[in-house]
């Protein structure tokens, strides 16, 4: 799904999505089968997963070593995309039946948990933009409370995660990209403006930093729900989750905006290699 972000990064995400699909097609029983690592020789298919992970982390290291500076507002929210892809990696092998299965004990289904993540992310954007506009230079109990209804009802939890897993993932992307577009140029002064979170006095910067931890908090909840449902991940599914997280670490170097063209090029090239390797690992099972 196209999102309000750099088109090259959108392309790279599509390549990673395809790579995850290819890797999930490898059964655990086939992980020990041979795979030819180009220009090196025969290893097993399992190592193909780790080769992708290693290459993504090497690309991350290359960008980090370049020392490209980033504005504080971007650095604060960049970890959010790591959390995003950790969640995507966890959700990747699930069926719609998994999303809607009742874990009992009045706990949320996985779909309800993800709907909360998506709706909350939209609300973070809408309400933080309001706090920014107030330009209040204090963060204590004198702060007013934000009015209700600033967020769009189209993003309510009741509908935020409707549809297929692809649609749910696309809506997560849109919620995040929409929030970053709304809050893409916060100054250091604006990050220090007063705001509220869960009615407590905080700062705009705190609310921005909360994006990543909120997604992670509920990714843990999804993990717990899968345990309650008795759904044990396969080895390949565990490895796919690691690959998705590695991509998230790399994407965090260029999201919400790349520091320079070289960093984006390194990222897109790594996504292309990941997609090619994943396709090769999958095809090795048909040889």
Where are these regions (language model features)?
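Active-site-proximal binding-pocket segments
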Residues: 124, 143-162, 179, 186, ...
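Short, contiguous alpha-helical
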Residues: 1-17, 28-78, 88, 100-152, ...
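A short, structured beta-strand-centered segment in the mid-to-C-terminal lobe
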Residues: 8, 12, 156-175
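Hydrophobic alpha-helical core bundles mediating ligand binding, dimerization, or RNAP-core interactions
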Residues: 80, 84-87, 91, 124, ...
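Glycine/small-residue-rich hydrophobic helix-like segments
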Residues: 167-196, 221
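Extracellular-facing binding/remodeling surfaces
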Residues: 92-98
């Amino acid at each position: 799904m196209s999102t309000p972000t750099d088109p090259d990064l959108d392309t790279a995400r599509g390549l990673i999505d395809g790579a995850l699909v290819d890797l999930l097609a490898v059964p655990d029983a086939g992980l020990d089968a041979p795979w030819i690592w180009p220009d090196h020789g025969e290893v097993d298919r399992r190592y193909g997963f780790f080769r992708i992970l290693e290459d993504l982390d090497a690309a991350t290291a290359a960008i980090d070593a370049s020392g490209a500076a980033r504005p504080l507002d971007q650095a604060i929210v960049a970890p959010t995309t790591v959390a995003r892809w950790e969640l995507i990696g966890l959700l990747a092998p699930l069926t719609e039946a998994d999303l809607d299965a009742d874990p009992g004990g009045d706990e949320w289904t996985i779909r309800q948990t993800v709907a909360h993540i998506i709706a909350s992310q939209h609300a973070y954007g809408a309400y933080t933009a309001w706090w920014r506009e107030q330009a209040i230079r204090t963060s204590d109990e004198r702060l007013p409370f934000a009015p209700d209804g600033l967020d769009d009802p189209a993003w309510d939890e009741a509908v935020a995660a409707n549809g297929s897993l692809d649609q749910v993932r696309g809506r997560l992307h849109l919620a995040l990209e929409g929030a970053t577009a709304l809050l893409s140029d916060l100054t250091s002064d604006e990050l220090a403006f007063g705001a509220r979170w869960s009615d407590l006095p905080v700062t705009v910067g705190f609310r921005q930093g909360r994006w990543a931890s909120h997604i992670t908090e509920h990714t843990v909840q999804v993990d717990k729900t899968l345990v309650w449902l008795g759904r044990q991940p396969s080895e390949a599914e565990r490895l796919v989750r690691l690959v998705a997280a590695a991509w998230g670490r790399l994407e965090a170097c260029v999201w919400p905006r790349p520091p320079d063209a070289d960093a984006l090029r390194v990222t897109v090239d790594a996504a292309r290699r990941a997609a090619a390797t994943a396709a090769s690992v999958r095809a090795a099972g048909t040889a």
